Amino acid sequence: MKLASGFLVLWLSLGGGLAQSDTSPDTEESYSDWGLRHLRGSFESVNSYFDSFLELLGGKNGVCQYRCRYGKAPMPRPGYKPQEPNGCGSYFLGLKVPESMDLGIPAMTKCCNQLDVCYDTCGANKYRCDAKFRWCLHSICSDLKRSLGFVSKVEAACDSLVDTVFNTVWTLGCRPFMNSQRAACICAEEEKEEL
């Protein structure tokens, strides 16, 4: 009995017992191809949503680093012209930040511009970019302390503002970083695959 049921399963899996249809082999192949293409597209869409969600939370395993699909290092995109740095006003979680929220502190704008340039450099490390940004912001407080003398309330307020700005970028900056890296970099094997 086991042999008969095994034979039946094998026979059905090989296409036995199916009524012959009028479809040509080309039509069957295109249906099969469409099905596989559709499944692949569905998995890629789900993967894309998952990656976007991870970027929002800070990257895979908390590491926000742009990598090519097969582990190779990304290469600078030929002819890529980075956007002009836009200061501290920008997009926050995909929403345009009103210009009134930009504090208009020239030194802070300079720090934000440096961060934009760092993010737009192919192969950049987000955490190094963020560390330079933090150092730049804290240098504003140091300069303020030197010019005003020791004023503890002003110094504390400056440090608090700088830490808030830095922590926001550190925590929620993965998505802008990844978007900048996608624009600035190219993965050679992925380009070949799309052709």
Swiss-Prot record:
Cofactor dependence: Ca(2+)
N-terminal signal peptide: 1-19
Textual note on the cofactor: Binds 1 Ca(2+) ion per subunit.
Gene3D superfamilies cross-referenced by the UniProt entry: Phospholipase A2 domain
Keyword Secreted assigned: yes
Keywords noted in UniProt: Calcium, Metal-binding, Secreted, Signal
Molecular functions per Gene Ontology: calcium ion binding; phospholipase A2 activity
Sequence similarity: Belongs to the phospholipase A2 family.
Record function comment: Not known; does not seem to have catalytic activity.
Name of the protein: Group XIIB secretory phospholipase A2-like protein
